[in-house]
Regions:
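Alpha-helical linker/edge segments of TPR/alpha-solenoid repeat scaffolds
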Residues: 2-5, 31-55, 95-134, 189-220, ...
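Alpha-helical solenoid repeat scaffolds, predominantly canonical TPR units
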Residues: 9-13, 53, 60, 65, ...
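TPR-repeat structural position
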Residues: 4-5, 66-67, 161-162
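Short coil turns that delineate tetratricopeptide repeat
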Residues: 18-19, 47, 64, 74, ...
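Boundary/linker segments of alpha-helical solenoid repeat arrays
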Residues: 17-30, 80-89, 174-188, 197-200, ...
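TPR repeat positional signature
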Residues: 25, 46, 50-53, 149, ...
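Conserved small-residue packing positions in alpha-helical repeats and bundles
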Residues: 1, 12, 29, 57, ...
Length: 253
């Protein structure tokens, strides 16, 4: 059966993941020229909801449509935490021996528990990279979760909502407390709204919980790296230096 719209979507989905594929590029050009194929038929069938909403939010932000940007960025955050919960749940499984032959793996109970626990925690930390990865892109989006609040604080400001602008600015500063521009923005929003009201506004609770949980996991992973030589690559740039053991910090210099 002739289904050009479905074919266009399938071709677009493949091309998003393989942007260097010339034959598929030609196919897309062919579908674009076909009568009856609309622009919105070229959809990514495998798109992650949180990334799709984020891209829409950023697009409206760039086009100076703050209300639409807020709508999609807030939806992106909702979808992000759904995806994060799913990703972390998948980490809860049996020990993956990776390069080991399980018949040759020899560990006492304490070491086996440690190896498995650290593998699960490392996998959960890896969800940061997994959720920020886009098809066809080699590198994940850096500081993906905090960046939502960078966009949102300014979008809320442009929309005249200083309470939300302050909330989002304070939330962003949980990750980057010394960010000069964000601190200046917060000071301005506070001056406009009034210090008495601004003082009552707190960073988003779910982000405070997320950050605290992440830091606890990082501390355990860095400790096991330092003591048991179980490697850990931190996916975040915002991790405070004091979370990393001194010996590891010195090695990284």
């Amino acid at each position: 059966m002739n289904r050009p719209a479905q074919a266009a979507a399938a071709a677009h989905t493949f091309f998003v993941a393989n942007p260097g594929h010339q034959e598929m590029r030609q196919n897309l050009e062919y579908y674009q020229a076909m009568v009856g194929v609309r622009e919105d038929d070229f959809t990514d069938l495998e798109a992650k909801p949180h990334l799709s909403e984020f891209r829409l939010g950023v697009r409206f932000y760039t086009e100076e449509q703050p209300a639409a940007a807020i709508l999609h960025l807030e939806k992106a955050l909702e979808e992000y935490f759904v995806a994060d919960a799913e990703c972390r749940a998948l980490c809860e499984g049996p020990y993956d021996y990776e390069g080991y032959n399980y018949l040759e793996y020899n560990a006492d109970l304490f070491q086996a528990i440690t190896d498995h626990s650290m593998q699960v925690l490392s996998c959960k930390q890896g969800c940061v990279t997994e959720l920020a990865s886009q098809p066809g892109r080699e590198k994940a989006l850096e500081d993906f979760l905090p960046s939502h609040f960078n966009y949102l604080q300014f979008a809320y400001y442009k929309n005249g909502n200083y309470e939300k602008a302050i909330e989002c600015a304070k939330t962003y500063l949980l990750f980057f407390p010394h960010d000069e521009v964000m601190n200046q923005n917060l000071a301005y929003y506070t001056a406009v709204l009034g210090e008495n009201l601004a003082r009552l506004i707190q960073p988003r609770e779910e982000i405070q919980v997320y950050r605290q949980r992440s830091l606890m996991e990082k501390e355990l992973l860095f400790f096991s790296y330092d003591i048991f030589s179980i490697p850990f690559v931190d996916p975040d740039t915002w991790t405070p230096e004091e979370v990393i053991p001194k010996r590891l910090r010195e090695k990284q210099k």
